[in-house]
Amino acid sequence: MFCIQCEQTIRTPAGNGCSYSQGMCGKLAETSDLQDLLIYVLQGVSAYAVKAREFDIIDHEIDTFVPKAFFATLTNVNFDDARLVEYVEQANAYRGRLQDAYETACTAKGVTPEQMSAPAQLILATSKPEMITQAAQAAPNRGDVHEDILGLRLLCLYGLKGAAAYMEHARVLSQTNDEVAGQFHEIMAFLGEDSVDVDKLFATSMEIGQLNYKVMAMLDEGETESFGHPEPTQVNTVAVKGKAILVSGHDMVDLELILKQTEGKGINVFTHGEMLPALAYPEFKKYPHLVGNYGSAWQNQQKEFANFPGAVVMTSNCIIDPNVGSYADRIFTRSIVGWPGVTHLVGDDFTPVIEKALALDGFIYDEIPHLITIGFARNALMAAAPAVIDNVKNGSIKHFFLVGGCDGDKAERSYFTDIATQAPDDSVILTLGCGKYKFNKLEFGDINGIPRLLDIGQCNDSYSAIQLAIALSEAFECEINELPLSIVLSWFEQKAIVVLLTLLSLGVKNIRTGPTPPAFLTPNLLKILEDKFGLRNTTTVEEDLKTILNVA
């Protein structure tokens, strides 16, 4: 086992990364090894997908499968070895299918098939124990490679994982694109070649950022076409009397299915975590039994799910051990999510969830409502832009802070609460992702009717923030980096990595990240990123605010 992809990975003077028998996320060594093998086989699939495309052979089923299966290897997504073995075997079958198609096309054209990369040539083991042994050749730190090269490879690999997750979210909303899929395969295949070319690896990281910008646009289009444009909405965040289902993850389509299937059954539906933004979409306001948001970010689920008196559905990341809070018998997984012993739902029938919710007590009384305001996504931001611009011009708004990303449980993450609460009263705070839960229930007031706290949405709604920044830069006839805008990104896993790469690929500079730098980035790489982009780690709130606001 070697895993260094998330913020909670082990860091010691002897070296960084989770190894031995179990990772800090709870992932067992065998599970980690199977994920490595899955990635390796997927790189082989992509290698053949690239070659097949040279003959105009595009297999949409495979284009769908590869990013979805890759998504299963993100932090806190799939811990179920049996499901991972199925993914590995399916990937191997798809690789064989593309290989046959490619070689047949070569024969028809009278050309010799090219020599393929090691992942494309792998002869897959036939049993789980043999696969785990075989996984050694698929480990991300395989071979004798300089730590800077390894760090760049991992930056690309983990960034592409984040993009794969967003591709799957977009696909669920019927948003696919052959060009995007082709570019994804090219990068995936390249990473399977174990390049030692620093310039090529760095350029690839920027290419991943550009790819993800396209994917976020697709996802934005899919969500708004399906559910309308989010609009400023007040949301209740406490218990409502009645039977209950809690929906966590990111999948709006699953939420819609659950709402339709629970109509008239006396069940209240709550969102959790990154599903909170759903409550701002017009289409979801048709359902009076979608009553609010319960709980906070992913790392608190073992307490929050244990206290929730109903059924829980995990539509995507993040899941952590449900046995700790003794709710494994009433949590259900969907799509790429998996935990051993937890009921996994295949297809669109949520009857088991409904039956479980009806059998449980539900909330026995209403709590006094606590309302927060959400829904400041792209359309709402664009509508507010003229008023925002006027307030900047008249001096009422002097600075913008974008504070968001992934949440986590380290004590140092109080930084993100403090920078939001200590930001000057003449500043506006934009937030997105589950990092918002560090401060989204606090009161920030308004500036001439413009709320000081604007909740943009999910982590992928970084796209909305980028559109606002572009609109402001055009209005003020300046570059984005010349705007009074400071980005403070809380990172935990691979989606945050690809959002960062997206911003860097667009030329956005002087971003602060925290609470700690990614362990896979060496001091040399961090210095390069600082020199090239002004990327830096958070320090103290007081020092960072002085620097941001140019206070002597």
Swiss-Prot record:
Pfam family, one: Prismane
Statement: the UniProt record of this protein carries the keyword Cytoplasm: yes
UniProt keyword annotations, A-Z: 2Fe-2S, Cytoplasm, Iron, Iron-sulfur, Metal-binding, Oxidoreductase
GO molecular function: 2 iron, 2 sulfur cluster binding; hydroxylamine reductase activity; metal ion binding; peroxidase activity
Major subcellular site: cytoplasm
Compartmental location: Cytoplasm
Residues the record lists as binding hybrid [4Fe-2O-2S] cluster: 250, 274, 318, 406, 434, 459, 493, 495
Residues annotated for [2Fe-2S] cluster binding in this entry: 3, 6, 18, 25
EC number: 1.7.99.1
One GO-annotated biological process of the protein: response to hydrogen peroxide
Reactions catalysed according to its record: A + NH4(+) + H2O = hydroxylamine + AH2 + H(+)
GO cellular component term of the entry, any: cytoplasm
Cofactors demanded by this protein: [2Fe-2S] cluster; hybrid [4Fe-2O-2S] cluster
Purpose: Catalyzes the reduction of hydroxylamine to form NH(3) and H(2)O.
Protein name: Hydroxylamine reductase
